[in-house]
């Protein structure tokens, strides 16, 4: 969409149209609402001032990219947002040439800017990288690693810091606002350059005094930190004032240096309900536009809610139980526990590495730490799991939510890989509940367990709802849930047990159904017992096939020279799994109970 010829009035009308389109689509499909509603004017101003056909537009996480998608080549397809084979909720180059990079995890944008700047310089091209990063993403260390290099290299670029009042403090008083307005004008930037030129000619003593005055001057402005890093700072700027945004971006574009443009926006702008509790409206399921109520009310407790209740009970029972989450208190259910025990449970912002290492120290001091984290974000703390927890065999418990297919968030968020990359770590044990009762037993076991433990559980509900009596959890002990009538064994892990049960109900024979419970260490005694009478093993797990439960069990058979047993796993093939409803995606991957049953 070409908007460069539009008047300010026409651009304002366009913002209203974009906001209406986003609101109606997200209410129907679900998605990230409040951050995108707040970034409409920002996106329009970016497309008006910069050249999206050549300038890399880089959206951190890309929770703020919906308007950008609509302004490029996806207006007519936007109704398919987050649907299978539809528009992704995140930036995705395979979807559009105007999406510079895949996004989904936080705080990568400034590093991408630095890399793009280096490439542009080496290629001798005239392009200007432009990044949008939220104040929440600025809580992660990677952003500061990139800023550190950027301030030293001085590559021309524009970093738009979208402050929607989730992390960064408000500017101080009228003086700060006045100084920021001055800094946003081209006149001030030219004046500042002339002053610096003048200082190069005056005696050292006078220059020193002038420099000291300038440093003191900056102490009362919000950009002091960035300027001390060697970056130009403009702001704060009203992120909903199109005229001011266009003027500010034009100034930044002409500066030929790294510029931080600090804008302030309102999350949920334009939808009164979403302008209220910010966290509630960040990521939403389909909802009623009139009252904001979710369309799909769950009849069964989610795995997240079960975990939250169980951990709260442990915390009430044992005073040494502590916990942490990395910017996901609501998503992991830790928010309810933080309210009750604010001195023992913490949200440490987007800092998975810090979260793990800090809890390792608490374990060393005699506390029992629980780390509530999404499976996909465990990837960000892999070194800390090995170096700071496993080597010393510290009793840290990793509670990994969103294991398996997470649905509409797609490739960057699927919890497919945790079994594969954690199984290789010595001293780390892997366990998964199949339902609420088994989860309760595992959590009770976890408190007394004296080594690192990783518990994985799905987004939403368990497939099973306590249909089978759960045994007290013991290390490396699985369970036989049903004895079959032949030589076929269905071996499930976690929510995969439910899939095994679903599949068995569709068959004309009765397989033996086994809950592995532990992926590491395995219940070798139970597996050897099954091997005596079952020469066909079918494995069910919501995880990657490479390094997954099937390969773990195949390795067990090989080690024990059980070459007569046929083994086949129903896990994810070696591919990144696209977005869409979980049931639709599983059917596409041929791992739904219906598709699996058709293979027998």
Swiss-Prot record:
<dbReference type="InterPro" id="IPR005477">
    <property type="entry name" value="Dxylulose-5-P_synthase"/>
</dbReference>
<dbReference type="GO" id="GO:0019288">
    <property type="term" value="P:isopentenyl diphosphate biosynthetic process, methylerythritol 4-phosphate pathway"/>
</dbReference>
<dbReference type="InterPro" id="IPR020826">
    <property type="entry name" value="Transketolase_BS"/>
</dbReference>
<dbReference type="Pfam" id="PF13292">
    <property type="entry name" value="DXP_synthase_N"/>
</dbReference>
<feature type="binding site">
    <location>
        <begin position="136"/>
        <end position="137"/>
    </location>
    <ligand>
        <name>thiamine diphosphate</name>
    </ligand>
</feature>
<protein>
    <recommendedName>
        <fullName>1-deoxy-D-xylulose-5-phosphate synthase</fullName>
        <ecNumber>2.2.1.7</ecNumber>
    </recommendedName>
</protein>
<dbReference type="InterPro" id="IPR033248">
    <property type="entry name" value="Transketolase_C"/>
</dbReference>
<feature type="binding site">
    <location>
        <position position="135"/>
    </location>
    <ligand>
        <name>Mg(2+)</name>
    </ligand>
</feature>
<dbReference type="GO" id="GO:0009228">
    <property type="term" value="P:thiamine biosynthetic process"/>
</dbReference>
<comment type="similarity">
    <text>Belongs to the transketolase family. DXPS subfamily.</text>
</comment>
<dbReference type="GO" id="GO:0005829">
    <property type="term" value="C:cytosol"/>
</dbReference>
<feature type="binding site">
    <location>
        <position position="271"/>
    </location>
    <ligand>
        <name>thiamine diphosphate</name>
    </ligand>
</feature>
<dbReference type="GO" id="GO:0008661">
    <property type="term" value="F:1-deoxy-D-xylulose-5-phosphate synthase activity"/>
</dbReference>
<dbReference type="InterPro" id="IPR049557">
    <property type="entry name" value="Transketolase_CS"/>
</dbReference>
<dbReference type="Pfam" id="PF02779">
    <property type="entry name" value="Transket_pyr"/>
</dbReference>
<dbReference type="GO" id="GO:0030976">
    <property type="term" value="F:thiamine pyrophosphate binding"/>
</dbReference>
<keyword id="KW-0786">Thiamine pyrophosphate</keyword>
<feature type="binding site">
    <location>
        <begin position="104"/>
        <end position="106"/>
    </location>
    <ligand>
        <name>thiamine diphosphate</name>
    </ligand>
</feature>
<feature type="binding site">
    <location>
        <position position="63"/>
    </location>
    <ligand>
        <name>thiamine diphosphate</name>
    </ligand>
</feature>
<feature type="binding site">
    <location>
        <position position="164"/>
    </location>
    <ligand>
        <name>Mg(2+)</name>
    </ligand>
</feature>
<dbReference type="GO" id="GO:0016114">
    <property type="term" value="P:terpenoid biosynthetic process"/>
</dbReference>
<keyword id="KW-0784">Thiamine biosynthesis</keyword>
<comment type="function">
    <text>Catalyzes the acyloin condensation reaction between C atoms 2 and 3 of pyruvate and glyceraldehyde 3-phosphate to yield 1-deoxy-D-xylulose-5-phosphate (DXP).</text>
</comment>
<keyword id="KW-0460">Magnesium</keyword>
<dbReference type="InterPro" id="IPR009014">
    <property type="entry name" value="Transketo_C/PFOR_II"/>
</dbReference>
<dbReference type="InterPro" id="IPR029061">
    <property type="entry name" value="THDP-binding"/>
</dbReference>
<dbReference type="InterPro" id="IPR005475">
    <property type="entry name" value="Transketolase-like_Pyr-bd"/>
</dbReference>
<dbReference type="GO" id="GO:0052865">
    <property type="term" value="P:1-deoxy-D-xylulose 5-phosphate biosynthetic process"/>
</dbReference>
<comment type="subunit">
    <text>Homodimer.</text>
</comment>
<keyword id="KW-0479">Metal-binding</keyword>
<dbReference type="Pfam" id="PF02780">
    <property type="entry name" value="Transketolase_C"/>
</dbReference>
<keyword id="KW-0808">Transferase</keyword>
<comment type="pathway">
    <text>Metabolic intermediate biosynthesis; 1-deoxy-D-xylulose 5-phosphate biosynthesis; 1-deoxy-D-xylulose 5-phosphate from D-glyceraldehyde 3-phosphate and pyruvate: step 1/1.</text>
</comment>
<feature type="binding site">
    <location>
        <position position="352"/>
    </location>
    <ligand>
        <name>thiamine diphosphate</name>
    </ligand>
</feature>
<feature type="binding site">
    <location>
        <position position="164"/>
    </location>
    <ligand>
        <name>thiamine diphosphate</name>
    </ligand>
</feature>
<dbReference type="GO" id="GO:0000287">
    <property type="term" value="F:magnesium ion binding"/>
</dbReference>
<keyword id="KW-0414">Isoprene biosynthesis</keyword>
